[in-house]
Amino acid sequence: AETPLKAEISETPGFRSIVAGAETVAAPGRDYTAKAILRGLEPGRAYYYRFIAPDGSISPIGQTRTLPEGGIDKYRMAVFSCSNMPFGWFNAYAHAAQVGDFDIALHLGDYIYEYQRGDYPSAKDTVAGRLIEPANEIVSLADYRLRYASYRADPDLQAIHARAPMLCMWDDHEFANDAYADGAQNHQANEGDWQTRKAAAEKAYREWM
C-alpha cells in the first residue's frame, strides 16, 4: 500500500521553525522510495530535513545545502567513485560524513556493482561481513532494487547521504560492466533482452538515487 509522507525543512536540527514543506508518497511502483521537491529556499544555505509518517513516526534527520548564486570564493566537494561493497568497508564515506567540511558530495559513478557474489571480487577477496543482496548477478528490476537496498543498509553510506546532498552520475556498473547502447560485456544472451535489462537498471537508479 502507498504511504503518504510529509517532508519538512528547517534551519535548525530541532525543527523549531519549519521554513518549507511538501507532501509525497512512498509507493510500491517506486520500490517504496520517496522524494520531495521543496521550493522557496535561500541559495547557499544549510538546511535540515525529515520525513513524517501518518502515525507520527519521524525519520532520521538529514542535512542538505542549496547551491550558491553569483560569485563565490570557495566551494568544496567530497568526491567518490567505484564503490564495490564486497571489496571492503565504506571508510571514505564514514570519514567524509564525520569531517563534514564540504558543500556537496559528488559520486562519479559505479555506485553499485552488478556482479554475483564471488565474481568480482572473488570469494577469497571478499571482505567478511560484506555480503551483497541478491546473491546472483542483478538482471531484473527486482534484482536492481534489492542491490540498491543492500548497499543503502550500510551505515556509512547512510551517514554520507544524511550529512550532505549528493550529486550522482551513472557509469557502467549501474547497468552492467562495459555497457554500451546495444549491450554490455557482462550481458549474455541467456540473461534476456538487453534493452529490458537497461530499462530496469535505469528505473531502479532513478527510484533510489
Language-model regions: role of each:
Residues 1-209:
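Metal-dependent phosphoester/phosphodiester hydrolase catalytic core
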